[in-house]
Every structure is written in structure tokens, then in C-alpha cells.
């Protein structure tokens, strides 16, 4: 009896272990999915790194643009450095602040849509016109925010249209293709014979006999 009880206990334990394994696997899968989804949302450190990188690239592009603009205005090689510095500052603020605000809003809201881009544009306008009057700052905020929002909406719409067109082309069956129309017109046999005799008469003209003088 004791042996039977011990064997039954072993069977129960093994069945419980086998039943708990799928649950543990399911929990591991859910934990993995949640961790992968959490990795999609950028962390504040990642936002700061993006801010630094975008600001540096914007400053470089702005300096090149400003220096070229100074040379175009014939300010000389030394005088163009002033324009290069101002343009580098403007482009660095544009790229850095916009990237930082978009990244932070994506982390807070958990979405990546045109609202984030519009708010980032507003913050960029405020940063550009910060040492100014409140009316000018508000106008710059509204201008940059509206422009960024509209541009992002147009980009999303174009990508959606491109995906829909490609999906339609892939799913379209060859049965819906229209058959090619034949433009050949049947010609009667009598017309063919008359046309062939006319062509022969053109290729082999008859020799006319003129009367000779005696």
C-alpha cells in the first residue's frame, strides 16, 4: 500500500510539473513580448543621444550652408565664418529640439503620430525665438507647429496610398486583365484580287509602241 501511494504521489507530481511547463512557457512568451514592446519606446538616455547627434549634424549642415551663403554674398573667406556660425546655431536648434521633443512625446504617449510632430514644431519655434516678445514667440510656435503637423500628415497619407496601391497590384488576379483587341479587319477575296492586280500593274508597266516615221 505504501508503494502504491508513493507511486501515485510521483505520478501526481510529474503531471503537475508537465502542466506547469506550458504555463511557464506562456509566461516566458508574454514576458518576452512585453519586453520587446517596451524596447520600442525610446528611453530618456536614447532621446538625449538622439538630441546630441541630430544637433551636431544640423550644426554641420548649417555651417556649410552659411559659409556658402557668405561666399555667395562676396563677404570673403573670413567674413563668411560669421554667417556659418549663425546658420549652424539655427540648424542645430531646429534639428536637436525637434528630435528631442518627438522622442520624449513618443515615450510619454506611446504613439508616433502627427500630434507629436506638431508639438515638436511648436517647441522648436519657441526655442528659435526665445529672446523675443511673447507675441513673436507665439507666432513662431503656431507657424512651426502647423507647418510640421501638415507636412507629417501629408507624408503619412502618401505612404498609406503607396501601400494601398502596392497591395492592390499584388492581389489583383490575371483574370481581371482586359483581353487585347485585334485591329485586323477581314478583307473580301474580290477586293484582294483587285488590289493584287493593281499592284502587279504598277510593278510591271506595259510598253507603249509609238509609230515610226517612214
Curated annotation (Swiss-Prot):
Bias kind Basic and acidic residues: ranges: 18-35
Transmembrane segments: 38-61, 88-105, 114-130, 137-154
Region (Disordered): 1-35
Signal peptide: none
Protein location: Mitochondrion inner membrane
Topology with respect to the bilayer: Multi-pass membrane protein
CC per GO annotation: chloroplast; chloroplast envelope; TIM22 mitochondrial import inner membrane insertion complex
Tissue-specificity statement: Expressed in young cotyledons, roots, flowers and leaves.
Biased composition, class Polar residues, residue ranges: 1-17
Stimuli inducing this protein: Up-regulated after antimycin A or rotenone treatments.
Alphabetical GO biological process terms: protein insertion into mitochondrial inner membrane; protein transport
InterPro entries, sorted: TIM22
Keywords noted in UniProt: Membrane, Mitochondrion, Mitochondrion inner membrane, Transmembrane, Transmembrane helix
Family according to the record: Belongs to the Tim17/Tim22/Tim23 family.
Described purpose of this protein according to its UniProt entry: Essential core component of the TIM22 complex, a complex that mediates the import and insertion of multi-pass transmembrane proteins into the mitochondrial inner membrane.
Name of the featured protein: Mitochondrial import inner membrane translocase subunit TIM22-3
Organism: Arabidopsis thaliana
Amino acid at each position: 500500500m505504501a508503494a502504491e501511494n508513493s507511486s501515485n504521489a510521483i505520478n501526481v507530481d510529474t503531471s503537475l510539473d508537465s502542466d506547469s511547463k506550458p504555463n511557464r512557457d506562456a509566461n516566458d512568451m508574454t514576458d518576452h513580448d512585453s519586453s520587446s514592446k517596451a524596447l520600442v519606446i525610446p528611453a530618456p538616455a536614447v532621446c538625449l543621444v538622439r538630441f546630441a547627434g541630430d544637433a551636431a549634424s544640423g550644426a554641420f549642415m548649417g555651417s556649410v550652408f552659411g559659409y556658402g551663403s557668405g561666399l555667395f554674398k562676396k563677404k570673403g573667406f573670413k567674413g563668411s565664418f560669421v554667417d556659418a556660425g549663425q546658420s549652424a546655431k539655427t540648424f542645430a536648434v531646429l534639428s536637436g529640439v525637434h528630435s528631442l521633443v518627438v522622442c520624449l512625446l513618443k515615450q510619454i504617449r506611446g504613439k508616433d503620430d502627427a500630434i507629436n510632430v506638431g508639438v515638436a514644431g511648436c517647441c522648436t519655434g519657441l526655442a528659435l525665438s526665445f529672446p523675443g516678445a511673447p507675441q513673436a514667440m507665439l507666432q513662431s510656435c503656431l507657424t512651426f507647429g502647423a507647418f510640421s503637423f501638415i507636412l507629417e500628415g501629408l507624408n503619412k497619407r502618401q505612404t498609406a496610398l503607396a501601400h494601398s496601391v502596392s497591395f492592390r497590384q499584388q492581389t489583383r488576379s490575371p483574370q481581371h486583365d482586359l483581353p487585347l483587341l485585334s485591329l485586323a479587319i477581314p478583307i473580301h477575296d474580290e477586293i484582294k484580287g483587285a488590289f493584287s492586280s493593281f499592284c502587279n500593274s504598277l510593278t510591271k508597266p506595259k510598253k507603249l509602241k509609238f509609230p515610226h516615221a517612214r
